UniProtKB/Swiss-Prot annotation:
Family membership noted in the UniProt record: Belongs to the thiolase-like superfamily. FabH family.
InterPro entries linked: ACP_syn_III_C, ACP_syn_III_N, FabH, Thiolase-like
Domain notes: The last Arg residue of the ACP-binding site is essential for the weak association between ACP/AcpP and FabH.
Organism this protein belongs to: Streptococcus pyogenes serotype M2 (strain MGAS10270)
Protein name: Beta-ketoacyl-[acyl-carrier-protein] synthase III
Superkingdom of origin: Bacteria
Length: 324
């Protein structure tokens, strides 16, 4: 049988840094108010870079690190809710920029679960035997979707990209997975709704910026994500003691605290970087993974079991246990 494994990781964030004090100068908030509620102190904001620009930086790094030629890449999946345009896909722009002429490319839209969903799909593509190498990138410029007068959401989000290179392997590395969607709760977190207007009717005005029912999302993350992780471990016979690190979507420090208690895993196993990047949606997990590799916490030698878990708009949530 053929399986997939993560062979390279990379990340990139825009240069512009925006601190909580910077935000306090343009809206009614303070560093203390933001940090005590979220664990976020600063975030990176794109000035003149689009989502594809961030993703291209990651793709270039993955190629350089791997030593592969671009035409050896079979597919590129970009997980994003902030694409450059409705079409072409952000992934198509990445494919062109790195000259991966043999690759097919498409975007995955699953909000903050996007990277986990895309990684699960990529694993199946390689397991089919038809493809050998693929890139999965989470990239966002959420600053373009934020209402900068709404302190309930503007303080949360940042821009960035992270990704992995997957290659075929004789050994199984994606050990367990669970993916979920509940569209009945979709209105809890929305952005970029299309207007219903046409030449024949005038419908409701489009909602362009991020709007969130914070309490509903907080409760959902603690209840549904915790339950799905516990179920995943039980069904796969992987215990909490087998897990070396937990890399969850970087939405809010309080959410991580509560999930750690719910699943009874030591808080020290939960890596985090939201303090420096904020919520980067589909990019948060791969950025966190890339930094953990840079720091030597995760070794990419196939000896560690890592829990990856994303959750967000849709509502969507999903987890993978991977051997890295």
């Amino acid at each position: 049988m053929i399986f997939s494994k993560i062979s390279q990781v990379a990340h990139y964030v825009p240069q512009q840094l925006v601190t909580n004090n910077d935000l306090a100068s343009i809206m009614d908030t303070s560093h203390e108010w933001i940090f005590s509620r979220t664990g976020i102190a600063e975030r990176h904001i794109s000035r003149d870079e689009m989502t594809s620009d961030l993703a291209i930086q990651v793709a270039d790094q993955l190629l350089t690190q791997s030593g592969l030629k671009a035409d050896a890449i079979d597919f590129i999946i970009v997980a994003t809710i902030s694409p450059d345009a409705t079409m072409p896909s952000t992934a198509a722009k990445v494919q062109a920029a790195i000259a991966a002429t043999s690759a097919f490319a498409f975007d995955m839209t699953a909000a903050c679960s996007g990277f986990v969903f895309a990684l699960a799909m990529a694993d199946k593509l390689i397991a089919s035997g038809a493809y050998q190498n693929g890139m999965v990138i989470g990239a966002e410029t959420l600053s373009k979707l934020v209402n900068w007068q709404d302190r309930a959401t503007a303080v949360l989000f940042g821009d960035g990209a992270g990704g992995v290179l997957l290659e075929a392997s004789k050994d199984k590395h994606v050990l367990a997975e669970t993916l979920h969607t509940d569209g009945a709760r979709c209105q809890s977190l929305i952005s970029g709704e299309t207007s219903l207007s046409s030449p024949y009717s005038i419908g409701k005005k489009a909602i362009a910026t991020i709007q969130m029912d914070g309490r509903a999302i907080f409760d959902f993350a603690i209840r549904d994500v915790s339950k799905s992780i516990l179920t995943l471990m039980a069904q796969s016979d992987i215990t909490k003691d087998d897990i070396d690190y937990c890399l969850l979507h970087q939405a809010n420090r309080r959410i991580l605290d509560k999930i750690a208690r719910k699943i009874d895993v030591p808080r020290g196993k939960f890596l985090e970087n939201m303090m420096r990047y904020g919520n980067t949606s589909a990019a948060s997990i791969p950025i966190l993974l890339s930094e953990a590799v840079q720091k030597g916490q995760i070794r990419l030698d196939g000896t560690q079991k890592i829990l990856l878990s994303g959750f967000g708009g849709g509502l969507t949530w999903g987890s993978l246990i991977v051997k890295i």
